[in-house]
Amino acid sequence: MESYSPSIQKLCVFLKPESDISNTGISYLNNFLADMSNAIIVESIHSSKSHKHKTILIEDIESALNVVFPSEIADSIINQSKGRIQSTSLKNLMQVKTFNNGGNNNNNNEQDNDLQEKEQNELSDDSDVEGFEIIPNNNNIYSHDVSLCFPIDLVCRVTLDYICRKKVIHQNPSDFYKVIEQQQSNHVIYTYISYALEVITTKILIKISSSTDLIDEDIIRKVIQDNHHLNSVRHKNIQASNIAGKLLDSSSSSNSNLQTSLSSSFIFSSSSNNTTTFTQQEQQEQFNDDKISGDEIEFEINNSKYLEKEDKKDQLIQKDEEIILKTFNDNNNNNNNNNNNNNNNNNNNNNNININNDNDNNNNNNKNNDNKNYDNNNNNNADKIEKLSPVNNNVKNSEIEKNIEKLKNINNNNNVEINEALISIIKETCKNIPSSSFSSVKNLKRSPPSLFKFKEPIDLVQVLAEGGIHMEAT
């Protein structure tokens, strides 16, 4: 079975000479790189089919790289691969021989031969010049080697072996990978994959701490999961592998109409024949729709929270007003009871003129006790009023406080004076409280303006007109 194990070991020795990599670490990293190669191929095939290309073109490969990798990594891989492809093309161009029409004489042929021999001698000079090492100009070695670690011959063998193992799992696999299986080993897609493998492997090994003696599977897995870009690539590799498995399960007849839509979120494809591939414009429209629906949900949540707060405020206001009403009613009841007691006491005094002094003393004591109890009730009521929160902005807190102080400082010697003073204080306090405060709870509820409480589209002009603002067309 072909693998990237030798390449991983070479790159690890070059980047981490002080560390060793375990077999489990090599196995995990090899599977990660193989899945990444498959993701690039799956998206390249999808791009080729969606644009109705007969084969995989460079624009399809670059589109796949932009989907699988973040923009910075994709741009780096594309630029390096383009430079390598141009360099290889120039070297191959130098080997092309020009054909003459026979019009040249033998002297011209001899001169051409001399120039060719001179150029070959200059190109084959591999000696060092002023301390610089000259790279041997051997096209047989370097034409297919993108880097020292991941030659494209190895990339091609591992990719084809990966496809074969994936097809063995399925009883009747489709021809999804047929377009890549028909390509030669020097196809440009392997150049791009080779650079992608080296860039990602280098990124993983560099992030491993230099103090690590043994690089195992857990360390590599943790590095990938902790890095946002690498973890994103890992998720896309897994999803692309699942998509390829579904496509291989499809029959060859229905696979021609099967569309695979891979985007930055890797949307899973449907096996229905009527499904169509989303274009970039349709994807943008879908994104805008999702964003609008998200904004509407957020607005509903905020609006409901606002309404809950307003309801709580109304409930607190209602409780305060109920306490005030209860306090005033208690005061009125106490006044009536005291008046009745005073009348009864006066009648008893008139009817019982001849009662002895002991009875008079008892009556006086009873009166004093009644006055004390009444004073206690008044003090309790004053404390209740003092603890209340302000209900209406029209009520003047300073006047209420003065009235409470008057209530506490009333002379307790005469019940009639107490009753008259209490009634006058209550009247003065009630004058400052509007009659609407004593109405039902529904009238007391202050709801926010409809402009900030709507749950469906409204006519803004109509709302402004209801508020007294009229707009005229100019």
Curated annotation (Swiss-Prot):
Residues 99-123, 276-295, 328-394 are annotated as: Disordered. SUPFAM superfamilies: Histone-fold. This is Histone H2B.v2. Belongs to the histone H2B family. Disulfide bonds: none annotated. One of its GO terms (molecular function) is DNA binding. It comes from Dictyostelium discoideum (Social amoeba). Residues 100-110, 276-286, 329-368 have a biased composition (Low complexity).
